[in-house]
Amino acid sequence: MAWISLILSLLALSSGAISQAVVTQESALTTSPGETVTLTCRSTTGAVTTGNYANWVQEKPDHLFTGLIGGTNNRAPGVPARFSGSLIGDKAALTITGAQTEDEAIYFCALWYSNHWVFGGGTKLTVLG
């Protein structure tokens, strides 16, 4: 669970990170209950690789943050199996298989660059219910 604390701390401090890399995500996506949805994370420095240790963090409307995925594809303890991380082409991806209304949230991707993390702006996922 230590990596989750690290990610949350870095999320709070990410505005102070100095980097030439920019991490981009879809600003918003909409899905329906039971559908599969994939959120992606791209780097301006080139293809995202396992060396970027892609992390995914969920922010619920009440500002509760939960670390979902670390190291590209390692699900955090207690995270439902419907959440999975991977690399698709040149991007990191978070796939939710069988989305539920409770999955409506903002999802942040963070990529590692040698000595610091860079966060994307987040994807607001709406689950129509």
UniProtKB/Swiss-Prot annotation:
InterPro entries the record matches: Ig-like_dom (IPR007110), Ig-like_dom_sf (IPR036179), Ig-like_fold (IPR013783), Ig_sub (IPR003599), Ig_V-set (IPR013106), IgV_Light_Chain (IPR050150)
Kindly indicate whether the keyword Signal belongs to this entry.
yes
User: From its record, what is one biological process in GO terms?
Assistant: adaptive immune response
Claim: Signal is one of the keywords in the record: yes
Keyword field = Adaptive immunity, Immunity, Immunoglobulin, Pyrrolidone carboxylic acid, Signal
Q: Which domain of life is it from?
A: Eukaryota
* Residues annotated as signal peptide: 1-19
Q: Which residues carry this modification: Pyrrolidone carboxylic acid?
A: 20
List the CDD domains hit by this protein, alphabetically.
IgV_L_lambda
Q: What is this protein called?
A: Ig lambda-1 chain V region H2020
Gene3D superfamilies cross-referenced by the UniProt entry: Immunoglobulins (2.60.40.10)
Q: Which SMART domains match?
A: IG, IGv
Q: Which residues form the Ig-like domain?
A: 20-125
GO cellular component term of the entry, any: immunoglobulin complex
